[in-house]
UniProtKB/Swiss-Prot annotation:
It comes from the Archaea. InterPro entries: ATPase_PP-loop_MJ1599 (IPR012121), Ni-pincer_cofactor_biosynth (IPR052188), PAPS_reduct_dom (IPR002500), Rossmann-like_a/b/a_fold (IPR014729). This is Uncharacterized protein MJ1599. One of its GO terms (molecular function) is catalytic activity. It comes from Methanocaldococcus jannaschii (strain ATCC 43067 / DSM 2661 / JAL-1 / JCM 10045 / NBRC 100440) (Methanococcus jannaschii).
Length: 277
C-alpha cells in the first residue's frame, strides 16, 4: 500500500485509511499539526538581525561542509543578515576534495574565516557499511559535538547549520550550556532547483559523488549497501518529508530513492584513504 501524499509504502511506514485515502502516520501527523513556517521564519530572523548588534569578531559559528546547503546558509548569513560567522568544517578523512575546494573558494569569496578540524571516522564508516546500516546520524552527532566545543571555547551562543528540515515545529533547538542551534534553511522552504540557482553567482561547483550529497564520499556506498540489505533507501524519511512539505515532487523523490550508481573512482578513492570496502 502506498501513501497518497508522500512516497512511503507499507514497507517503510505504517499506512492507515484516512477519510477514504491511504495515508502514512507521518503525513497524518502533519495534517493534524501542520508546521507554521512563517512563525519559524520570524523567530529565526529576530535572532539573527539582533545578532548584528552584538560586538566581537564573530557573530556565530556556521557548521560548514562545503556542500550546497551550508554554502547557501553562508550566503544568507552574509548577504541577508550581514553577519560574520566563523565557518567550522570537520574533515572526517572522507570529505570529497571538491567539497574542500568549494569551502576554500566560497569562504575566500565572502572574506570569512574557515577552521578545518581533521578527524578520522574510518572505524565508524567501516562498521556501518559492513552492517549495511546508515552512518549519517552517528557522523552528524560527532561533527556537531566538535562544532559545539568550538562555539563554547569562543564564548558564542549560536550554531547555524544548513539543514533544510526543522525540528518538528521549530528551526531552533537548545543545546548544552545555553548554546542554540539554528537550522537556517528550514523556514524558507527552498526547493532544490532554487538552491542551485542561488549558488550560481558563487565559486561553487557541484561534484558527482553518488547519492544526494555534495560533500561526502561515503554516502553513495552506504546507500548502496543499505539498499542491498533492505530493498529501500535509508533516506526515505527525509525524502518523504520533502514531498510532504511540497519541496520535492513525487517523481523526483522516487528517482532520489533509487539505488545509487556509485562511480568506481569513488570506491578507489575511499580505499586509497584507508576504508576497507
Amino acid at each position: 500500500m502506498k501513501c497518497s501524499i508522500c512516497v512511503h509504502t507499507s514497507k517503510t511506514k505504517k499506512i492507515i485509511n484516512y477519510e477514504g485515502k491511504p495515508i502514512c502516520v507521518d503525513c497524518l501527523t502533519m495534517l493534524k499539526y501542520p508546521p507554521n513556517f512563517e512563525k519559524m521564519k520570524k523567530e529565526v530572523e529576530e535572532i539573527l538581525y539582533n545578532l548584528k548588534k552584538e560586538g566581537g569578531k564573530y557573530h556565530c559559528i556556521l557548521a560548514f561542509s562545503g556542500g550546497k546547503d551550508s554554502v547557501l546558509a553562508l550566503k544568507l548569513l552574509k548577504e541577508k543578515f550581514k553577519l560574520n560567522p566563523l565557518c567550522v568544517m570537520v574533515d572526517n578523512k572522507y570529505m570529497a576534495k571538491e567539497a574542500i575546494e568549494n569551502a576554500l573558494n566560497v569562504t575566500k569569496h565572502y572574506q570569512v574565516d574557515l577552521m578545518i578540524l581533521n578527524r578520522d571516522y574510518t572505524d565508524l564508516f567501516e562498521d556501518a557499511i559492513k552492517r549495511g546500516e546508515s552512518p549519517c546520524r552517528r557522523c552528524s552527532r560527532l561533527i556537531l559535538r566538535e562544532v559545539w566545543r568550538v562555539t563554547k571555547l569562543l564564548g558564542l551562543k549560536y550554531i547555524i547549520t544548513g539543514h533544510e528540515l526543522p525540528f518538528g515545529h521549530s528551526a531552533i533547538r537548545e543545546m548544552k550550556e545555553g548554546i542554540k542551534m539554528i537550522r537556517l534553511l528550514a523556514p524558507y522552504k527552498f526547493k532544490e532547483e532554487e538552491k542551485y540557482k542561488m549558488l550560481e553567482d558563487l565559486p561553487w561547483k557541484k561534484p558527482d559523488l553518488g547519492g544526494y550529497t555534495t560533500n561526502c564520499l561515503v554516502l553513495g556506498v552506504a546507500l548502496e549497501r543499505f539498499y542491498d540489505k533492505y530493498g529501500f533507501s535509508f533516506e526515505i524519511d527525509r525524502i518523504a518529508t520533502l514531498v510532504r512539505l511540497g519541496l520535492l515532487s513525487k517523481e523526483k523523490a522516487k528517482k532520489e530513492l533509487e539505488k545509487p550508481k556509485v562511480p568506481k573512482e569513488i570506491y578507489e578513492e575511499l580505499r586509497r584513504r584507508g576504508l576497507k570496502i
